[in-house]
Amino acid sequence: MLSYGERLGSPAVSPLPVRGGHVMRGTAFAYVPSPQVLHRIPGTSAYAFPSLGPVALAEHTCPCGEVLERHEPLPAKLALEEEQKPESRLVPKLRQAGAMLLKVPLMLTFLYLFVCSLDMLSSAFQLAGGKVAGDIFKDNAILSNPVAGLVVGILVTVLVQSSSTSTSIIVSMVSSGLLEVSSAIPIIMGSNIGTSVTNTIVALMQAGDRTDFRRAFAGATVHDCFNWLSVLVLLPLEAATGYLHHITRLVVASFNIHGGRDAPDLLKIITEPFTKLIIQLDESVITSIATGDESLRNHSLIQIWCHPDSLQAPTSMSRAEANSSQTLGNATMEKCNHIFVDTGLPDLAVGLILLAGSLVLLCTCLILLVKMLNSLLKGQVAKVIQKVINTDFPAPFTWVTGYFAMVVGASMTFVVQSSSVFTSAITPLIGLGVISIERAYPLTLGSNIGTTTTAILAALASPREKLSSAFQIALCHFFFNISGILLWYPVPCTRLPIRMAKALGKRTAKYRWFAVLYLLVCFLLLPSLVFGISMAGWQVMVGVGTPFGALLAFVVLINVLQSRSPGHLPKWLQTWDFLPRWMHSLKPLDHLITRATLCCARPEPRSPPLPPRVFLEELPPATPSPRLALPAHHNATRL
């Protein structure tokens, strides 16, 4: 047997130069030691093939997995690289930390612009349909019908995109004696439904990913489902007994209530410096039209003149009167400083421009917010946040968790003074999976309560002669939401809004166009249809509503039995297959919509043809590689 030194001196192996040297490794050279291994053996050098250049090596290679490697044989340099590894890992970590620190202020900036875009969206809807909303409120004969009042509350709140505005109009009408408290209660219920359309629109911005869209749409519609279910139960109860009217009247009579201060403008202090540069509105015009003051019908909602100390004080001047006041040199007023102050455009044109701009800003900020939240909430950070938000209190206080979430939702809504802003802000988090729908449900219920506390504080700022009726209306809003919570939250089996929202989310993730159809039906077509039927008289409404309600209850009952105990049903009723397909499936409508969109869409360019496949059998035979003159059972790595 040859010694290790004799094998090193054999003609098949030559010593390695100081730098360079090619080592052939592959299936045929599995026993060849690497230079790093040989450096650990004292008195040895690495195996190499200095006589084979790159061209010769390329000729001797074969396509069966052999790899050509270049090794650095200097152990000093290897040791230096080992010492420099921590430093090389530290630089990417510092860069990642710097990027995270930079993303936080950017995320706060986009969140600020997102809230401002919601404010501008509300202003745009008021410019486009504010006077129409005032005209709707003006007809007291319509509002005396409870169903018509409910629909009016929905449509007006959708038009002005602010339940606070619609509620303030109702309070003004009750205070002036144009509307009774009992007639205003259904309108309050309708405004509660209409305010939930904003976060549903926000959920549409996450339609790119089906999973995120399913969660976001379910989290947004849980608010709608709660409001609709509460109205379906409490509106007939109120029409039959008037319990909200009697409870609030007793509360107002039992307390010696004095006028207070205005509701604190906590969020507006931050957003108004930006939004007042875009648009300023005179909301008293809508209230005046609703209360029957026809002198302001031709006045613009765009505010022209403001007080110099506070650029919010509204004035009821048209543009022509404003220009004449400027020539008279009114020292107590100065011109407002916003983009549309001197445009001369009508309110509808300004409203449409502002609507388009606010929607673009809303979509841009929301998309960037979602992307940044995706990059920030990764790995352990997302897990920690999910555990903190979605974990219940330890037993036996598990039941307290939901009510604590309600308090948090009410507090946050009181701070931002808008349930739409709060629910729209948590909708992207629901879509990302940070907040579960089970946790978002009590947060949404708390936001419903929080927006009523703001209305109560605003009512306390009313004059003494109007305080009683204004405070009673605000309390009706509060007790309506409390009654809904008592119906649909304390007992887990009664939390139907969560199940309904999840079903809507699954259906919307499968058919994305269903979200737009849902918005049109629930907030426009169905309220308009019910409004038209109710205006024909209660006989027509009962004649149409009773069969429709019975059919709806029958379908719901059969669906529940089909999913839980189909054996109790006859075979033909265990599925809906006996009906035409369009009556129990959305696939036919989906095919029509898909064809329509494909006809309008531009054809996609064809991808270039793929290169021809080369199979292993078609490769040329491999050239045999040189072998080292080493015994098979004496590997250098085993010494």
Swiss-Prot record:
Keyword set, alphabetical order: Cell membrane, Disease variant, Disulfide bond, Glycoprotein, Ion transport, Membrane, Osteoporosis, Phosphoprotein, Sodium, Sodium transport, Symport, Transmembrane, Transmembrane helix, Transport
Example GO biological process: response to thyroid hormone
Gene Ontology MF: a single term: protein-containing complex binding
Function: Involved in actively transporting phosphate into cells via Na(+) cotransport in the renal brush border membrane. The cotransport has a Na(+):Pi stoichiometry of 3:1 and is electrogenic.
Protein family membership: Belongs to the SLC34A transporter family.
Taxonomic classification: Eukaryota, Metazoa, Chordata, Craniata, Vertebrata
Disease affiliated with this protein: Nephrolithiasis/osteoporosis, hypophosphatemic, 1: A disease characterized by decreased renal phosphate absorption, renal phosphate wasting, hypophosphatemia, hyperphosphaturia, hypercalciuria, nephrolithiasis and osteoporosis.
Listed transmembrane segments: 104-125, 146-163, 166-185, 348-370, 413-436, 467-487, 514-534, 540-561
Extracellular-side segments: 126-145, 186-347, 437-466, 535-539
Cellular compartments annotated: Apical cell membrane; Cell membrane
Subunit structure, interactors included: Interacts via its C-terminal region with NHERF4. Interacts with NHERF1. Interacts with TMEM174; regulates SLC34A1 internalization by PTH and FGF23.
Identification of the protein by name: Sodium-dependent phosphate transport protein 2A
Catalytic activity: 3 Na(+)(out) + phosphate(out) = 3 Na(+)(in) + phosphate(in)
Cytoplasmic side: 1-103, 164-165, 371-412, 488-513, 562-639
Disulfide bonds: 225-522, 306-336
Glycosylation sites: 298, 323, 330
Tissue-specificity statement: Kidney and lung.
pH dependence: Optimum pH is 8.0.
Membrane among keywords: yes
Residues where Phosphothreonine is found: 508, 623
Consequence recorded when altering residue 155 to P: In HCINF2; loss of phosphate transport activity; loss of localization to apical plasma membrane; display a complete intracellular retention and no detectable actin colocalization
Effect of mutating residue 153 to V: In HCINF2; loss of phosphate transport activity; loss of localization to apical plasma membrane; display a complete intracellular retention and no detectable actin colocalization
NCBIfam families: 2a58, Na_Pi_symport
InterPro entries: Na/Pi_transpt (IPR003841)
Modified residues (Phosphoserine): 14, 34, 607, 625
Gene Ontology CC annotation, any one: cell surface
Membrane topology reported for the UniProt record: Multi-pass membrane protein
Origin species: Homo sapiens
